[in-house]
């Protein structure tokens, strides 16, 4: 049978790889997309003994569902590596779907991707690698990087004590995904590889095409896996939370209309309010106890500070004094300068921090992550309260 260019590329790929004398073992998380596919291929090329691992999170369409399982299995067959599927639907239901639902019920706007990374993906991957005993590392297709603490010596690091491993932004500023990884631990970082960390997205696609990977031309997912699965977050919310009628109130006290549940609103929202007012109005805050959506002019959305809870310090020891940071309060937003101040409890332990922005910020949204950087280094992050 006549060989295709794809077959020849893969043959050359494996031929060069087989010259490697000593191999290390690594588990690669595979979603069925081009990023994780190329990560696996590059690790094979670099001499790792690779096994693909796909987590079955939900039934249905999408990269986290049945479609992704099929694509991941086919890729592993092409690369000649083992592929394992773990049924993670129960833990995903408990740690992501349930907690996302609870967060919306409290009037927060949650970040399901961070929940999944912290409590599902990396935990399941690490546990599986440990169970294999001879597998020392794990890898994903995230656009982020890891370095050792010596990297930080070039920075102004007043009041910062760095841990052994540092989490860094990806080299591609437009694709950097470190924001979603602030909850990782040193144990995970010590075993983790990001093969795409130094690459740009266009290079990823080009390299996948060169190698003839079956996922090379697969469209990039533009939404959360929950959106892919349910069709929209509104459908997800309607399926999991009962409607509860309440009032939409201007911050001046005037009742402007009704709503069918605070879970349908987020701070800064303008569209879909269903109210009439001479000037555009935006969601200012959500009162869960009174079931009220407060709205205001855009100028009223700005905050000078925020309280950050459940902070995880991934790259540094917990600071005992105030520190200067660049804070990112939503994905895709530019980091802004701020001062982070520890708030001590009566027993002198720290559970929350006050973030004071150098310049007031609009739509600081409870439930979203505030992630702290020093240059390229992700120091830590927590939830906006």
Curated annotation (Swiss-Prot):
Keywords: ATP-binding, Cytoplasm, Disulfide bond, Nucleotide-binding, RNA-binding, Transferase, tRNA processing, tRNA-binding
Location relative to the cell: Cytoplasm
Region annotation Interaction with tRNA: where it falls in the sequence: 175-177, 330-331
GO MF terms, alphabetically ordered: ATP binding; tRNA binding; tRNA-uridine 2-sulfurtransferase activity
Broad enzyme group: transferase
BP term (GO), one: tRNA wobble position uridine thiolation
Site keyed Interaction with tRNA: positions: 142, 368
GO cellular component, one term: cytoplasm
Entry EC no(s): 2.8.1.13
Reaction(s) this enzyme catalyzes, per UniProt: S-sulfanyl-L-cysteinyl-[protein] + uridine(34) in tRNA + AH2 + ATP = 2-thiouridine(34) in tRNA + L-cysteinyl-[protein] + A + AMP + diphosphate + H(+)
Disulphide bond pairs: 116-225
Residues annotated for ATP binding in this entry: 29-36, 55, 141
Annotated catalytic residues: 116, 225
Pfam family, one: tRNA_Me_trans
Primary role: Catalyzes the 2-thiolation of uridine at the wobble position (U34) of tRNA, leading to the formation of s(2)U34.
Family label: Belongs to the MnmA/TRMU family.
PANTHER family the UniProt entry points to: MITOCHONDRIAL TRNA-SPECIFIC 2-THIOURIDYLASE 1, TRNA 5-METHYLAMINOMETHYL-2-THIOURIDYLATE -METHYLTRANSFERASE
Protein name, UniProt field: tRNA-specific 2-thiouridylase MnmA
UniProt organism field: Prochlorococcus marinus (strain AS9601)
